[in-house]
């Protein structure tokens, strides 16, 4: 039986790969997509998500979400993904539109209609998820679990300690981690290992139309290089859903720093139990890289 999922995203070049996997992995049933400001503005992430859905002829409803963090000024990662968020490929025009309600309400409505609890997957800042949990707490029993790409037990990638998705909206992340729902965190500890090799990247143009499109995007992606390999951060959250045996997880207490002058956005991961607090997150710490690369090749071969 396919696993029903809702995907909250901020496309983003590596988001595009994660979306492809969510659509084409035969184990998954992607029922709803929502967008959030992150890699670029929410207007751009929404446009990019709709372009991808049209490219794959995927009839999946999409709702536009939060344009700004809960309390902070927005920031983006255009230096990594290009000003449009998906630089490098010219998508054809279409007339698709997002749903007419905010993302968190679209998630609420879809959860309440679902015949069974649904897995939420968040691969951008957690603003929409925090709004859902704070404004619609009655939805919690309908959430099977939340799988996120975000955080780190060690080094950051936008500050010395903070990972980008958490650092964009630390208050939202703090709200989510305090919520009591089941959380799996695929952070930089594993996503920095999730590298597609130059040899594999070179095969993409001959793979299928998705391979050609992704190869064009990857030439503008600045998380690695075509010569040294590219990190597939967001794809790890989808990979865990399909191939959890590729990941080593540890239950930990995780809190988000919201006050520090130099540490705001840091995920404080208590690996050794120093704080004597109950674990609230399953934290991915190791990845079977070869197994991950093999799975990516398999799923992208299906993305025609």
Swiss-Prot record:
- Record bears the keyword Membrane: no
Top-level EC class, please?
Answer: hydrolase
Mind listing the UniProt keywords for this protein, alphabetically?
A: Glycosidase, Hydrolase
Domain of life according to the entry: Bacteria
**Which InterPro entries did the record assign?**
I/U_nuclsd_hydro_CS, Inosine/uridine_hydrolase_dom, IUNH, Nucleosid_hydro_RihC_nonspecif, Ribo_hydro-like
Q: Record's PROSITE patterns?
A: IUNH
EC numbers for this chain: 3.2.-.-
Q: Which Gene3D superfamilies match?
A: Ribonucleoside hydrolase-like
Disulfide bond sites? none
Q: Entry's SUPFAM superfamilies? A: Nucleoside hydrolase
List the catalytic residues. Answer: 233
**GO MF annotations in UniProt:** purine nucleosidase activity; uridine nucleosidase activity
GO biological process terms, alphabetically, are: purine nucleobase metabolic process; purine nucleoside catabolic process; pyrimidine nucleobase metabolic process
Q: Which GO terms describe its cellular component?
A: cytosol
PANTHER family according to UniProt: INOSINE-URIDINE PREFERRING NUCLEOSIDE HYDROLASE, NON-SPECIFIC RIBONUCLEOSIDE HYDROLASE RIHC
Q: Which family does it belong to?
A: Belongs to the IUNH family. RihC subfamily.
Function recorded in the entry: Hydrolyzes both purine and pyrimidine ribonucleosides with a broad-substrate specificity.
Q: What is this protein called?
A: Non-specific ribonucleoside hydrolase RihC
Organism of origin: Escherichia coli O7:K1 (strain IAI39 / ExPEC)
């Amino acid at each position: 039986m396919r696993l029903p999922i809702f995907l909250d995203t901020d496309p983003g070049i590596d988001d595009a790969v994660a979306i492809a996997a969510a659509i084409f992995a035969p184990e998954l049933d992607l029922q709803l997509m929502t967008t959030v400001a992150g890699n670029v503005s929410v207007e751009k992430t929404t446009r990019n998500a709709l372009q991808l859905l049209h490219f794959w002829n995927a009839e999946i409803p999409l709702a536009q979400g939060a344009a700004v963090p809960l309390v902070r000024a927005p920031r983006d990662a255009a230096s990594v993904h290009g000003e449009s968020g998906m630089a490098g490929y010219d998508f054809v025009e279409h007339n698709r539109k997002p749903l007419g309600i905010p993302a968190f309400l679209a998630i609420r409505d879809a959860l309440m209609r679902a015949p069974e609890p649904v897995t939420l997957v968040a691969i951008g800042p957690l603003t929409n998820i925090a709004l859902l949990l704070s404004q619609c707490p009655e939805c919690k029993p309908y959430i099977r679990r939340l799988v996120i790409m975000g955080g780190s037990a060690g080094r950051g990638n936008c500050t010395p300690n903070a990972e980008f998705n958490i650092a964009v909206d630390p208050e939202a992340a703090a709200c989510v981690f305090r919520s009591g729902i089941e959380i799996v965190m695929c952070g930089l500890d594993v996503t920095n290992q999730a590298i597609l090799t130059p040899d594999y990247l070179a095969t993409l143009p001959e793979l299928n139309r998705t391979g050609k499109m992704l190869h064009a995007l990857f030439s503008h992606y600045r998380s690695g290089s075509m010569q040294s390999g590219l990190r597939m951060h967001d794809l790890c959250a989808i990979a865990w859903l399909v191939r959890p045996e590729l990941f080593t997880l540890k239950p930990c207490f995780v809190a988000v720093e919201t006050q520090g002058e130099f540490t705001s956005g840091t995920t404080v991961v208590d690996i050794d139990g120093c704080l004597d607090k109950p674990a609230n997150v399953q934290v991915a710490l190791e990845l079977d890289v070869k197994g991950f690369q093999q799975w990516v090749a398999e799923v992208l071969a299906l993305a025609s």
